């Protein structure tokens, strides 16, 4: 989602930087960090934080005078100066504007601290100071004493805590509580999570008091399940229950927005369409609002007056939004919606949108290894499953720039798509000959190598996509109006506009984190006149039924913004067409209390000190167990035990989630499943215990699968070193390669070599699905070489005729060194903190922005600067061409467009009865050409 507010800059540092400083004098904060702005930038410790209720409230409390309009004006003025001639006057003016822009965006009133060690947490609660200085002048930019504010559900899992300026933290905490009844009892971790909703990135939209709050619709039905109980012993007890009473909250996290008011929100968000769902926030309010014509339903049933949860009667014709109690988390802390709304106005809450369903739905997406590791396919079928991905890589290797564009931008582009980006894919749209350029070709080659590596670890392209989930909305209407609950969808049925239009009859539904084949379900895609009448406009939602186990199968999916991956890939349908049952985990509860700040901090401590592994560790262990399972015949004692262990990982994964909610987890992951030492037989063991340990010793999953060498570089190095050493030994002793010996050992000595190779091998090379895919991709590309074409004269296409001062070529050395250092620091930080893809993207954007600011301080004219950097990287072959695109991407595209009449050409799909210009992956395309307007404006591309 595009943010309508600019990203603010906050300090984010590890706790060790703060607490290792000497203690200060009495009366001052105990811990203090003195650091320069340049240090923060170079170490990626000045990070972006998107607009949220907290940011907007602090602006108001502090009185910062922040103005988004002024930010836009400054960016435009900077754009004008970077487009004007170089002069000292312009240079000084540019630096002044950059400083004003930085001062507006810099936000020292909140900071994020990564707790390096558990013992640091309590020290940080005592308070600390961060002083930020100007590197050149030594001037103090900010000096802030911080106190504890909160942690979010996502941040605490990474041991990250937010602290706020001590002068404003109490008022901010008061506003966050929004006048709630403080005597109400809650589970501390849950209330902490509800309060943390104020940190969600969001765009405010039109507010309304015309809101109806209704109770959730909960149904139950009998079904067959596998029940796991982890409360009594380390290894969860599994029970087959044939008539399990399955409960389902059909409105868990979703409500309605009138179609008229949805159009107002679409306009607020500057959209040219009305989304099928808005993921919203308000005070203690979270979930998806679906544009649904509940007023037309009222006309059909002839009922217009509905009682809300407080007993107040509302005319549905006067209602803009319908909330459910699962959305308004603290509904019982208010006496009416009017009281809630009054507090929201007092504390400046309003409805805001964090995300919305897209206008164009992806035609293709890639799988991950969790989605495909449990496939039951023959080797031939498995190869056919990955073949389109292999062929795609080979096509991109060629010199047809059209194939490259289809790969880079996907197959979902339309005539209306805004295709202009500041990267080489847009350059190819403007001039296809640039596919021969050495700099661009090197980026394509790097992309191909990465794509091969990704394919080895299960990133396989299929027809399918992620879409937001919703349960049969008519059921909520029937519930609200007191009608019989029937819904429009039956068991195993879904409605989805995308799949209906594609003619799909059935799809596979999956959702991460996925552990076992029990987490998959094949569902039927249906429609009829009644479904089209009520749901036909909801493009971007997967509407599921309210009478089966799909939510339970897909890792406890709910309706507050969760999405599911669906695909009609024939091999995934075939590979998952098997008999399986949903796995249900028995869960403990936590007593409710009247919560204080101490309770929230105790929840933090519980997470930081928790011995329960995170979900990622658990799912990786399940993958390792799945790999070991491949060694044994299906149905054997070993296979059945390992199959149980994979299913038990669903319980262990749930334990990790429950730990974050403050639930006490009595047992950790069974060590005997992953450690041979736990299976060591002792002399005093009973006969039964010796037999158990002997059996367990045969099926220990203590290694990562072979394909994980593409995920963990150090693992790959270890394996490569072992293979190199053993290959030399085999050639010397046996006159055969290591692979030849492994495949067919001829002597006892060779068999011993095979045995010890597998013992010392850091990875498990069992023939599991993912290892097979790894080997297939490796075999396919073992002699594969990327094109290495260098035609330096293509650099002239990227430049204009404008000259530049030759001093720039020398002055760029320092900027290039900063580029290398900052990217090295980014990679190091990512390896340590295991940041998400969105966090990595944000960090990379920060680097680009900071480097651009430094570049303009060297020379204010961006056209001349661009020409200089083109020469700098092309005259020095060892310099990264990515440096050029980071600094000058916008100007490069502008240069190319101005030379080609501002035209771009890109591939779009054609219908069966239309002529096509080329085929790619079995799909038919034509090149569509259009004129791009307004790109000379700084804001358009930037």
Residue ranges and their predicted role:
Residues 582-586:
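Active/binding-pocket-proximal capping segment
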Residues 508-510, 564-567:
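Short hydrophobic-aromatic micro-motifs
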Residues 553, 566-581:
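Short active-site loop/helix that positions an aromatic residue
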